[in-house]
Amino acid sequence: MKKLKYIAPILIAVACLGFQQAKADFVDYTLTTSNSPGTLGTGPFGTVHVDLTAGVATITFTAASGYLFVDGGAVAVNVNASAWTIGNFTSNGESVSSSGAGNEDGFGSFNQKVSMQDSSNGASIISFTLTNGSGTWLSAANVLAFNESNWLVAAHIQIQDGTGNTGYAAGPAGGSVPDGGTTVMLLGVALGALGMARRFLRS
């Protein structure tokens, strides 16, 4: 019984940590590649934060310093679902709205674009929510899927160097989707807890 007194708090701590991770499920992507490096530079051009809470995914695009999201296809994602609803749009520039599916020049077609009317008042932050209408996303890393050209996210960007030049950027390129290290961290904590439990049981 004395040994159980020590083991119980460890197991509770592991369970609580897992619960907290489930509550704060997110993944980040980087817009690393442009369709016109000679005009836009080499990047990175911005980040995309995907947060999944209670089945609702909040997608936040943040432009890197020196860039803004502009015009049609200001931002785009490839949603991992056959049906979904989009809403709760925010922009710190011109207002944005859903513009359905379409091409982001050089990076193929994305099934969900969010657009502005023009490039007169670009935004450094654009956010919106997605709700799956055809199933359940198991994690934030499961919300998006690679398009046929092997890109997850893209954006129409304008470089802030006085030229007004625009182009497109996307990322990540093909391969697997990162899970933010959550799986590895939880595995490490669990193994550590088991090791401590074994020590107490043997003593």
Describe the residue ranges of each PLM region:
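Bacterial N-terminal signal peptides that target proteins for export
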Residues: 1-8
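Sec/Tat signal peptide C-region and signal peptidase I cleavage site
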Residues: 19-24
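Helix-boundary and membrane-interface capping/anchor signal
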Residues: 25-176
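Short, charged juxtamembrane terminal tails flanking transmembrane helices
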Residues: 200-203
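A short, hydrophobic C-terminal helix/tail in secreted or cell-surface proteins
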Residues: 178-198
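Bacterial N-terminal signal peptides
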Residues: 9-16
